[in-house]
Regions:
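Active-site-adjacent pocket-lining segments in enzyme domains
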Residues: 1-124
């Protein structure tokens, strides 16, 4: 999480390859807050990995709330929608976690505990 993934994780070929390999082998994938930025370039069968999947991540409203909308290279909510994700969100700053198959995403830092529990459930 944190804003860093918008610049590094989203563009790192090794991170992208790792997420794609996990997905292709059915392993659980978890991303909370800004970490869903890694789904910017990840693919599955030539399509965005999140296409048609229920996902969440830091909302445009939350980004506006921290006054970084005009600084970040892209908005997580907009990117997930543009990549065909079925974006869901809860109230700003409240815990909200979405699980779709092997993919667990959390909206913001308040979602960390619930996101970890959802990921552990997939590992059980």
């Amino acid at each position: 999480g944190g804003h860093g993934p918008l610049w590094d994780l989203a563009e790192d070929a090794h991170s992208i390859a790792l997420i794609e390999a996990f997905n292709n082998s059915g392993k659980p994938i978890g991303a909370v807050c800004h970490a869903p930025a890694v789904f910017r370039h990840t693919r599955h069968n030539g399509e965005p990995l999140v296409k048609g999947r229920a996902v969440t991540g830091f909302t445009n409203g939350e980004e506006d709330g921290v006054q970084l909308t005009d600084i970040v290279p892209f908005l997580v909510e907009d990117m997930l929608k543009a990549n065909g994700g079925v974006y869901e969100k809860g109230d700003d700053w409240a815990s909200h976690v979405v699980t779709d198959g092997n993919l667990v995403t959390g909206q913001n830092p308040a979602s960390s505990e619930a996101g970890a529990k959802a990921l552990l459930k997939l590992l059980a």
